[in-house]
Regions:
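Charged helix-capping and loop-helix junction motifs
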Residues: 142-152, 183-189
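Conserved SGNH/GDSL esterase-like catalytic core that processes O-acyl groups on lipids
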Residues: 57-148
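A short helix->loop->beta-strand "cap" motif at the edges of active sites that frequently abuts
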Residues: 160-164
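Alpha/beta-hydrolase-fold catalytic nucleophile elbow
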Residues: 131, 168-169
């Protein structure tokens, strides 16, 4: 897709901050363009709490030193393709609102694996980027989807009380997908996410 996913910021419980980034910034790090002195380390914008974040200026890669990306197979691509080696990625194929708590997805230093939410609780971050829902939107009602997503976000907020939480929209699908998804439903659910 040529359009970046939009994001919604959740203010941290113990700090108000104008430091907000869009997923466009995250995806812009994938390009091989060199960093320059014109790039900032922290984007600035006037987005209100809970509103979509506008695209902001490009940031240096060190902006993501204290960031974590949480999600399913789409998010896994960040580590798979080594887009941002300095950010942590807690993601796995097929992760949904249930398996984020149970599926042993994250490899520990000792070789064992633990669920994403257990791994998230082990370290404090300044920025948490969340992209979930693609594995649910095909079958869940909007109300059920929002209740489950909201529960996961509440748990993330409790674990990361000082972090800014960015809820990224689900990406569109091609016409030939086999998962009961269509872009109209994805758009509907993305709009509904704005109310969380």
């Amino acid at each position: 897709p040529s359009q970046p996913a939009s994001s919604r910021a959740e203010e941290p419980a113990s700090q108000a901050s104008s430091e907000q980034a869009s997923s466009a910034e995250a995806s812009s790090q994938a390009s091989s363009a060199p960093e320059s002195a014109q790039e900032s380390s922290a984007p600035q914008n006037d987005a209100a709490y809970g509103e979509p974040l506008p695209e902001t200026e490009r940031v240096r890669s060190d902006y993501f030193d204290d960031a974590v990306f949480v999600g399913d197979s789409i998010t896994s691509g960040i580590s798979l393709y080594q887009i941002m080696d300095n950010a942590d990625v807690l993601a796995d194929t097929g992760v949904n609102f249930d398996t984020i708590y149970t599926k042993e997805s994250v490899r520990q230093e000792d070789g064992t694996r633990i669920p994403i939410m257990d791994a998230l609780a082990q370290k404090q971050y300044a920025k948490v980027y969340v992209m979930l829902g693609g594995n649910e939107v095909g079958g869940d009602s909007e109300e059920f989807f929002l209740a489950r997503y909201g529960s996961v976000l509440d748990d993330i907020k409790a674990m990361q009380p000082n972090a800014i939480i960015y809820v990224q929209s689900m990406l569109p699908v091609t016409r030939n997908n086999n998962y009961g998804l269509d872009n109209a439903k994805i758009d509907q659910f993305n709009q509904a996410l704005m109310g969380l």
